[in-house]
Amino acid sequence: MGGTRFVGKPLVSRLLQQGHSLTLFTRGRQPVPDGVEAINGDRGDDQALDQLKGRAFDVIVDSSGRTLKDSQRVVERTGAPSHRFLYVSSAGVYAGSETWPLDEDSPLDPASRHAGKGETEQWLMREGIAFTSFRPTYIVGPGNYNPVERWFFDRITHDRPIPLPGDGTTITQVGHVEDLAEAMARSLEVDASCNRIYNCSAKKGITFQGLIEAAALACGRAPESLDLRPFDPSALDPKARKGFPLRLNHFLTDISRVERELAWTPRFDALACMANSYQRDYALAPTSAPDFSGDEALIGA
């Protein structure tokens, strides 16, 4: 489900390398690799989804489902996969905490905008459907349609002042899309990953200021040349991303389970994530007309 955009592209590439035969159900019109079957349709459209009726799959990969119903409607038509239901969840399911990093047993937030992903994981468990679920923090890398690293690159390359929440020491966590795809593909070959949930991001967190400096280095700019403008985030919803592209509280997960059970470790740290994203994405297609209007509410610029 999905497969032609951000997470899907590197995952499709790895699954093909493993020798899988793939069928993509996507509403996009982007070309698919040779030998890959494409079914076009919107997963929210019953008639479009009915194209899957009677089809049986060894593995179902759901990289685009956000609610429990999204995934249920697929399985209602195909039946449970014989090997694994591979799910892209989110570390956004976790509740706030006074202790960090968060592990996979940390409490969930029923009010989170990602709550549907947690509900889907619970449903897969209850139904006895063999599954593996991944909970990334911020996924970055080439093709990212969420304005995470691009938000910083826009301001740095246009010599704009950069809003900085508080003193810049809040810790966040990014992970490269290719690391996530590699871990997901590997999980299909590891029996121990069945019915497991994994945090999956870079190994270490990074402060807001550290991430901005990493973005500057990616752009070929000296971090000390940046015009950082602190603002008070206390009046804002800490989980909102209005004005600043990251939630305004700590956001850090423990990835030791996925490293241990999949014998896998991420190749990209935060610095490498930003450099790779700039070189393979932003430098090739800079934002044509960046919108800096949201900065005024934060720093008056």
Task: Give the ranges of each region predicted by the language model.
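N-terminal Rossmann NAD(P)H-binding glycine-rich loop of SDR-like oxidoreductase domains
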Residues: M1-Q18
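Rossmann-fold cofactor-recognition segment
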Residues: G35-D46, S64-R66
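NAD(P)-cofactor binding segment of oxidoreductase domains
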Residues: R55-D105, A115-W123
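Conserved beta-loop-beta element that borders a ligand/cofactor-binding pocket
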Residues: E121-G143
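Substrate-binding strand-loop-helix patch
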Residues: G143, I171-E178, Y198-A218, F251, ...
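Substrate-positioning beta->alpha
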Residues: P147-F152, P165-L188, N195-R196
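Mid/C-terminal beta-alpha module of Rossmann-like enzyme folds, strongest
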Residues: R186-G243, L284-A301
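C-terminal amphipathic/interface module of NAD(P)-dependent oxidoreductases
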Residues: L246-A301
